A protein has these predicted regions:
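Conserved beta-strand-loop-beta-strand element in the redox core of flavoprotein oxidoreductases
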Residues: 160-179
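Rossmann-like dinucleotide-binding core of oxidoreductases
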Residues: 194-276
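Short hydrophobic core segments
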Residues: 44, 180-191
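Intrinsically disordered, low-complexity segments enriched in serine/proline and basic residues
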Residues: 1-6, 13
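N-terminal Rossmann-fold NAD(P) dinucleotide-binding loop
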Residues: 50
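Core beta-strand elements of the Rossmann-like FAD/NAD(P) dinucleotide-binding domain
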Residues: 37-39, 175-184
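Conserved N-terminal/central alpha/beta ligand/cofactor-binding core
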Residues: 9, 23-30, 56, 62-63, ...
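Beta1/beta-strand and adjacent pyrophosphate-binding region of the FAD-binding site
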Residues: 35-47
Length: 276
């Protein structure tokens, strides 16, 4: 069979040349204009850790910049998830052991009146279920009230170093490449982006041992909540086992689901994808 020639777009070729040692692209990045004056703290990533870091630094009087690649704050907690765990101890009688900024976030969510506190299916303590859009608003309100400068739709492309110290990050924005300079940088990207670009020690998932596949969940609509409440976890797992034994291809025979802040909508954690 004859091989087909594949035409690679010029934009991709340009990136490949740069990655292969062509310095032209890198020089263009280093010469990118400053997005704002020097910050005391620059945080990359606005998930729970990044937004908390930015908020804590700003409350201590630092001039803080928060960079987020999405068009909203919150990272995975607003893009995918709907429940906080870790505020309470495991067991039947949960004790609250986390406060601080976590409390501030939950208090702000409660003002929006769509918060459900519920027990974990496996006894891991109370969970705090929220509406993702409410959490987007809560984080935005809190960081702006603290005086944090927020830049959305910013993707880190590189860093500028001086004697192994990060001086600025190069970001791709809607207006093109730009630099953000700071005295201290916090990598809350979730992917160790700053570590990678700066050459700092880091671990690549799956390089030395199997990496767990990302958790894949889905939501079910039009669920009869009263009927669902009558079905306990033991019955659910038993039904899944019987279905698998009858020939239904189920990669996982246990799991859980929970009510959300929207009537008739339940979230599940019941799928499994083989690690590779």
């Amino acid at each position: 069979m004859a091989r087909r020639a594949i035409r690679i777009p010029s934009e991709i070729l340009q990136v490949l040349r740069w990655l292969n040692g062509n310095t032209t692209g890198r020089l263009a990045m280093i010469n990118a204009p400053m997005l704002a004056p020097l910050f005391d703290v620059v945080v990359v990533g606005s998930g729970s850790s990044g937004a908390s870091a930015a908020l804590a630094a700003a409350r201590e009087g630092a001039k803080v910049c928060l960079l987020e690649r999405s068009s909203f704050l919150g990272g995975t907690s607003t893009a995918v998830l709907d429940t906080f765990y870790g505020f309470y101890t495991p067991g039947v009688h949960s004790l609250k052991v986390v406060g601080g900024i976590g409390d501030d976030v939950v208090d702000r969510l409660k003002k929006l009146d769509r918060v459900v506190e519920r027990p974990n299916s496996y006894g891991a303590g109370l969970g705090i279920t929220y509406h993702p859009d409410d959490l987007k608003c809560a984080w935005e309100q809190l960081v702006l009230e603290a005086g944090v400068t927020v830049f959305l739709n910013c993707w880190v492309q590189d860093v500028q170093l001086d004697s192994d110290c990060i001086m600025s990050v190069i970001v791709a924005t809607k207006r093109g490449l730009a630099q953000v300079a700071g005295r201290t940088f916090v990598d809350a990207s979730g992917d160790a982006d700053l570590c990678f670009w700066s050459g700092s020690p880091h671990v690549t998932a799956g390089e030395h041992e199997e990496a767990q596949s990302l958790t894949t969940t889905f939501r079910m609509c039009n669920v009869d909540a009263i009927t669902r409440k009558a079905v306990d976890l033991e019955y659910l797992h038993s039904a899944m086992t019987k279905a698998a034994e009858a020939g239904y291809a189920l990669p996982r025979r246990e799991g859980s689901d929970h009510a959300t802040t929207v009537d008739g909508v339940f979230a599940t954690n019941i799928t499994r994808i083989q690690s590779f």
